[in-house]
């Protein structure tokens, strides 16, 4: 199940949040259709902006749109002309006042949507698909928050007559673990042979109690601190029974003799053992 379903929808309310936040009763279908139109409007005209995500939040008379982009300068435009144009188009589409927020993505190499878009752009420029996939994996694995990545391309790869799918993976990508923070991205490359779909899964660690687990501070090969032994000789063990040298009668007598000799007193003789009868 985890291998087929969309990782975002599979983990809603666990590690991921909804990208559209609003409540409606009778206008639910209209709002869903409007959200799809908003995302389509932003994706068609801003291909070069590197939009990673679009979040929509609604109130009674206002719509807030958050655009997460790797190139905010392209979205804003010169003196804000592009941002004003986008805001005007959204207000015309929704019929409400639109609050537009443009947020910059700090690490585009660790965003699955941007990685998929980068691979698709290389495929459109006639770059070999294996080379594009490996380059994307190498750049993503350099990021400290990326624990694993999987990149898959499907279509007429290399201009072949029959379509197929190939993927490369590095690190861990646990798709069926609900606490795993997995980012997913999909993009289509338009080539002369047809469209090639690019899918990217990026694993960024586990989320427990709403917080991402950090890597262990101590390295795996670090040695535990050794406890110092007290000075002096360690008592010897006699035989396989595991008793110490003072655990028998002869041992206790020898120990008392050593103590009395050290104190300057004559040592007491050990009691003689009673002879055992051998009568039959």
From Swiss-Prot:
It comes from the Bacteria. GO terms for cellular component: cytosolic small ribosomal subunit. CDD domains: KH-II_30S_S3 (cd02412). The keyword RNA-binding applies. Residues 238-280 have a biased composition (Low complexity). GO terms for biological process: translation. Keywords: Ribonucleoprotein, Ribosomal protein, RNA-binding, rRNA-binding. PROSITE patterns: KH_TYPE_2 (PS50823), RIBOSOMAL_S3 (PS00548). It holds the Pfam family Ribosomal_S3_C. Residues 215-280 are annotated as: Disordered. GO terms for molecular function: mRNA binding; rRNA binding; structural constituent of ribosome. Residues 38-106 form the KH type-2 domain. Gene3D superfamilies: 3.30.300.20, Ribosomal protein S3, C-terminal domain (3.30.1140.32). The keyword RNA-binding applies. Binds the lower part of the 30S subunit head. Binds mRNA in the 70S ribosome, positioning it for translation. Belongs to the universal ribosomal protein uS3 family. Part of the 30S ribosomal subunit. Forms a tight complex with proteins S10 and S14. NCBIfam families: rpsC_bact. This is Small ribosomal subunit protein uS3.
């Amino acid at each position: 199940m985890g291998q087929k379903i969309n990782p975002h929808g599979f983990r809603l309310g666990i590690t991921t949040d909804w990208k559209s936040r609003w409540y409606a009763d009778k206008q639910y279908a209209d709002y869903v259709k409007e959200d799809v139109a908003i995302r389509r409007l932003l994706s068609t005209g801003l291909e070069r902006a590197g939009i990673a995500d679009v979040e929509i939040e609604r109130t009674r008379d206002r719509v807030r749109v958050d655009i997460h982009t790797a190139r905010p300068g392209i979205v804003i435009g010169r003196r804000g002309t592009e941002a004003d144009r986008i805001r005007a188009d959204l207000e015309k589409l929704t019929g409400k006042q639109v609050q537009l927020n443009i947020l910059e993505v700090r690490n585009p190499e660790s965003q699955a949507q941007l990685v998929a878009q980068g691979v698709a752009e290389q495929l459109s420029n006639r770059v070999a698909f294996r080379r594009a996939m490996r380059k994307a994996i190498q750049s993503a694995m350099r990021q400290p928050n990326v624990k694993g990545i999987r990149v898959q391309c499907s279509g007429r790869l290399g201009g072949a007559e029959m379509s197929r799918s190939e993927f490369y993976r590095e690190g861990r990508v646990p798709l069926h673990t609900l606490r795993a923070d997995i980012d997913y991205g999909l993009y289509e490359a338009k080539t002369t042979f047809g469209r090639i779909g690019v899918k990217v899964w990026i694993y960024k660690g586990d989320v427990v109690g709403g917080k991402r687990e950090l890597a262990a501070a101590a390295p795996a090969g670090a040695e535990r601190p050794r406890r110092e032994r007290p000075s002096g000789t360690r008592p010897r063990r006699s035989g396989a029974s595991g008793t110490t040298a003072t655990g028998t009668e002869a041992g206790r007598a020898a120990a008392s003799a050593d103590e009395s000799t050290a104190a300057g007193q004559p040592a007491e003789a050990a009691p003689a053992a009673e002879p055992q009868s051998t009568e039959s």
